[in-house]
Regions:
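Structural signature of the two symmetry-related core transmembrane helices
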Residues: 83-97, 304-322
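Extracytoplasmic gate region of multi-pass secondary transporters
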Residues: 36-37, 231-288, 345-348, 352, ...
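Helix-breaking motifs and short loop linkers at transmembrane-helix boundaries and internal kinks
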Residues: 48, 80, 101-107, 118, ...
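A late C-terminal transmembrane helix in Major Facilitator Superfamily
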Residues: 356-393
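Cytoplasmic helix-loop-helix junction between adjacent transmembrane helices
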Residues: 111-151
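Extracytoplasmic
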Residues: 17-51, 251-256
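Helix-loop-helix hairpin linking two adjacent transmembrane segments in secondary transporters
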Residues: 146-197
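Conserved MFS/SLC helix-loop-helix module at the cytosolic interface between two early adjacent transmembrane helices
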Residues: 67-105
Length: 442
């Protein structure tokens, strides 16, 4: 790949603005979804909920988020990131606000389902924005930057939400965050523009498309969307991300509860200790994207530069999760959990970077959303399975070991199922009558 075409000052300005807004929106996204986890003990006490009921509440968001991925990815590719993310921000912020007004399990369950639908466009939008505005050799780090919003938001969430809840109460905290999200929606719509709305020079167009396969289409069709499911790489990404997000959501949903229940920490101490692992995740996410770019520049194929780091980091996450389960020291437990989140976010960033090179441009958000669908099926199961295991055994040890085992299987999926990138020519080949029902080897 030639390195002679570089981004012009105008493109760099667009890139910086887009990434900054994606980070802000992503941080709010994760603060909102973490609010229930941080307020877990307070909400259980006020509403009289059991641990297993809290597990169902934590999973409600994840189920609606997971199943909303499939149509959302295609909608981002069809309609564009600007309008879809604006609508998503507005919807999830209203759902967050409603969370502060509930008085029963069923009302809270409905608000969490709505939150999942609203948050669904965030990361498919990020994948499409990176594909639209960055050269392939620069997409890894750009992906790491927007993806770090997930850990940055969670790291900010723990001390911020703890402060807000201790100062104003958990209900006011939900309302405050809902209003903040509505403001972000207005700013995103005002500042971001899709490429078709921006006048670009030939040099700028060359930078954006250099290294991409020829014959790229502009919008995804329903036929192309369906064909993505007939490629082994799509299924490798879906199965691989399942374990990544399962492990992530053990910690995202239960880390505060784990530190309080298993490690007997106070609410105040938990707010500080639980922020450390997610801060490590921010670093891991950015370094994962940087590593993918370095490997591409050293001649590793775009797909392999993503899938191998993703698999290796996921194996490391599983090992550290088992270690965290068995150490007796609270300090060592936080150290191993920090290492787990550092590594799992290396995997997460490499997975999203993979979505920017694994399919044609017009299918970027679609395949990213399919991957995210698989991931959040795992994410939806994690809080419920963890809650049921803890309630049954009285300990988090078995729950963490189960998560680690799932991570090993998903790492194998990245290594052995993800293969070649999906091409427009390959999709056209599968459209022929003779190929009906076949699975493409890519």
């Amino acid at each position: 790949m030639s390195a002679t075409v570089t981004a012009t000052p105008k493109l760099k300005s667009i890139q910086r603005t887009a990434l900054a807004m994606l980070v802000v929106a992503g941080a709010v996204n994760y603060i909102d979804r973490a609010t229930l986890a941080v307020a877990n003990p307070l909400i259980r006490e006020e509403l009289g909920l059991s641990i297993s009921q809290m597990g169902y509440l934590l999973s409600a968001f994840l189920w609606s988020y997971a199943f909303s991925q499939l149509p959302t990815g295609a909608m981002v590719d069809k309609i564009g990131p600007r309008r879809l993310l604006t609508a998503g921000l507005a919807l999830w912020s209203l759902a967050q606000l409603l969370g502060g007004l509930v008085h029963s399990f069923n009302q809270f369950f409905a608000a969490r389902l709505l939150l999942g639908v609203g948050e669904a466009p965030q990361f498919p939008t990020g994948a499409r924005v990176v594909r639209d505005w960055f050269n392939p050799r620069d997409r890894g780090l750009a992906t790491g930057v927007f993806n770090c919003a997930s850990t940055l938001g969670t790291a900010i969430a723990l001390p911020l939400l703890t402060f807000l809840m201790l100062t104003f109460g958990w209900r006011a905290t939900f309302v405050i965050m809902g209003v903040a999200g509505l403001l972000v929606a207005v700013v995103w719509f005002a500042l971001y523009r899709d490429p078709k709305s921006v006048a670009l020079t030939a040099e700028e167009t060359a930078y954006r498309t250099e290294g991409d396969p020829p014959g790229q289409r502009t919008e995804v069709t329903f036929r192309e969307w369906k064909l993505l499911f007939r490629f082994r790489t799509t299924w490798g990404m879906i199965l691989g991300y399942f374990g990544c997000i399962y492990l992530t959501w053990i910690y995202a949903a239960w880390l505060p509860g784990y530190l309080e229940i298993e490690r007997h920490m106070s609410v105040k101490a938990t707010g500080i200790a639980a922020a450390i692992p997610f801060a490590c995740g921010v670093v891991g996410g950015v370094l994962g994207g940087y590593l993918a770019d370095v490997l591409v520049r050293r001649g590793v194929s775009p797909v392999n530069s993503r899938k191998y780091p993703a698999a290796i980091a996921l194996l490391g996450t599983s090992a550290c999760t088992v270690a965290a389960a068995y150490v007796t020291s609270n300090t060592l437990a936080v150290v191993f959990i920090s290492a787990s989140l550092f590594l799992v976010y290396v995997t997460s960033t490499c997975a999203w970077a993979l979505s920017s090179v694994a399919a044609p441009t017009n299918c970027t958000a679609s395949i990213g959303a399919m991957q995210n669908f698989g991931g959040y099926l795992g994410g939806a199961l994690a809080p419920t399975v963890t809650g049921l295991i803890v309630q049954s055994t009285g300990s988090f040890v078995l729950a963490l070991v189960v998560g680690a085992a799932i991570g090993v299987v998903s790492a194998a999926s990245y290594l052995f199922v993800v293969h070649d990138p999906i091409t427009t020519a390959g999709m056209d080949q599968l459209s022929e009558p003779a190929a009906r029902g076949a699975i493409h080897p890519a």
